[in-house]
Each structure stands twice: as structure tokens, then as C-alpha cells.
Amino acid sequence: FINPVRKSGLTKRMMGIHPERSLPGLANPAYMKAYEKGYSVESAADHERAVILWVDEFTQANDPMLVGKACDVLGALGYSPAVVCSPSGRAALSGGFLPESKKLAQKALKKLQNAAKTLKNAPILGLEASAVLSAVDEYGRLLPEEKAWIEAQRIATIDKFLADDLPKLDRASDAFEAYEEEILLHVHCHQKSLESAGDTAYVLQVLLGAKVDRVKSSCCGMAGSYGMKRENYDMSRKMAELVLLPKIESFEGEVIVATGTSCRHQIADFSQRKAEHLVDTLWEHLRF
């Protein structure tokens, strides 16, 4: 499941990564093929509450189990998820590799358009904010000929989708065991900028009855691959130490939710705590 070579100092030196940084594992691609087969577009075609779950490159490589959990959560709320796996091009775009990011965006849009056509323009949900919101914010400039289609779709993080839909659902919280303890929440920068910092908190409050303490900070300091680089390590840590790390150190509760994969990586590297995705927290409290 995880390539042991990734742990070596030589690998980090070759990639320009600081030696104190951990590297994420790489999942077997067979996981995604199984999800796309098990939650196919065709199987959701006759469902009036079909949704397209767009699985990005970060989730595919680093956290594949999140896909199955998301499908369980969506299913418990009455949706029929169709899994579409395609890299968003976010990493290439952040690195300045525009031709490569454009190719990946074109490929992703083609798969999403095909799914949306079959599913009558069903909502498109993403698990990683930086990836799914690339389509919302940047695909229109990369692919101006697709701008009208993009703007006509409902494309959002799963956090925002649920926050918007929960008022329409009857007794949605019945699908979950209550968790009335405090949850510490850190929201990804893309979400704060393009959606709402309150969406994730609202979902946790409505579905679990949780008390949510949102970390009022700016960037966690990872900023995609920025914090991984050898020359940026000290600055990345200083950014985390401004607000985020002290807040985590003083938090006495059990559950920390961080909505970005880079945010969770930063917390794991610089604290003794593990942060989880919103979907992880909801799944752990499902009434199976």
C-alpha cells in the first residue's frame, strides 16, 4: 500500500524536501477502479438524488478510504453517489506548470461532463477544497470555452453541499450518533476564500450536535507544497505557530477536523495530534 522508498532521506533530498518532513503514502490505483465500478454513474442514473463525487489526485493517492466513507455518509442521507476519479491539476497549477494543468483540467472536465449528462446535471462534490475549487475559480481561465458550462453547474466541496442541502432534509441527524463534545475545526484557505468558513461547522452542529470551536487563523503554513520545501520549512513552521499550533496544544477535546489535506499534514508534522476530514468524523458516528 505504501512505497517504503518514500521514507528515505535520499528521496527527500532529490525532491528538495526538508528532512524533518514526513511524506504521504501512495495508494494502489486499484482502489479507485473499485470505487468507480462499485459506485458507477450508470448505477446512479435512475436515482432522483444522484450526486457526482469527484475524487481528486490528493484523495486518490493519500486517503482512498475517504471515498468509501463519503459514499456511506451520502448514502445514509439519501443520496446516490457516482464516483468519478480524475486529477484536478491543482498541484501542477500551483507549481506553475500551466500546460500540464490545462491538460488535466480538460480531462477532468470531460469525465465530469459525461457524468453530468447521464445524471441530468447532478451536483458535483469534492473532498479536497483546493482541487474542487480549482474548477470553480480557475478552470474558466484555463479553458475559457468551458466557462459557461462550469458556471452553470453546482460544483462545491462536500462541506458546502451538505450545508446548503441540510435544511431540505427531513430528520437528517437521525442517521448519526450524537457527539455533543467540542470539536476543534481548522478550515482550508480555499474554502474560506471561495465558499464559507462556517459550512463545515454548521454540518457538524446539525448532524452531530457538536460544539465547534473554529480556529481563527490564516494559512496553516503548508500552502500546498510550499511548506514541504527545504528552504521554506522554518517559515512554514512559524506560520503554524502563530495561532494554529497553540490552539491545538491547548485543546483538551478528542476530535480535530481540518478540511484540507495539506492542513492535516501540517498538523501531523508539527503537533502530537491527528486531524481528520469532515467525512471521517461523520462516518465514525454513522448509525450502521
PLM region spans:
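Iron-sulfur cluster-binding electron-transfer modules in prokaryotic oxidoreductases
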Residues: F1-F288
